[in-house]
């Protein structure tokens, strides 16, 4: 089977995955504490809150949570398009966008209860984050939530006994550990800095963006920073993103 990982080399992919998962956990904890238990990246929790709000007739609360879910979905949508169109600049572009959005929320107006405008940039960034990296099957790595990671770890343990687990099995437990550790750090940062703690997550995203920008310039086309993967979660026969980009920009 063709390896559709992005980046192709685990030397950069795994550390990036763990750092970004930690960043997501940190941002989610800050948002949860700052915005009345509203999740920034845990859409399962927000979906439960939406259902409970509808059942109780709390329409402002239901609209608030539904709008966050919609923005997160928009982030995944936009991130996937960026991944497909940015070519070899995929990682730098996505990470710089995420860093900018994590800062932007601090300057946004709060908005009315049903539409928390200052929350949307953070949620958009975390939705976009899930299109940043891919596993060997071309699936987007779930960096901002761990339900899938826990399930894959459990099924991987069973497959370890039955025959051989998938290659992606080994990263699931570290991803859970990174996200939960990030949540602890986010809780501590919020205690001392309040909403301004988002600046720490933005700084981490910017640091990673700078690192991959330098690597892209120094080693263009290297497995450390590139790959032949199609867009995240694309069909098995989809062309690699660089080929997609060339076709789309070729004269008709």
Feature locations, PLM:
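Symmetry-related core transmembrane helices of the 12-TM Major Facilitator Superfamily/SLC fold
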Residues: 96-101, 196-212
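Hydrophobic core of transmembrane alpha-helices in multi-pass small-molecule transporters
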Residues: 18-28, 37-39, 101, 113-144
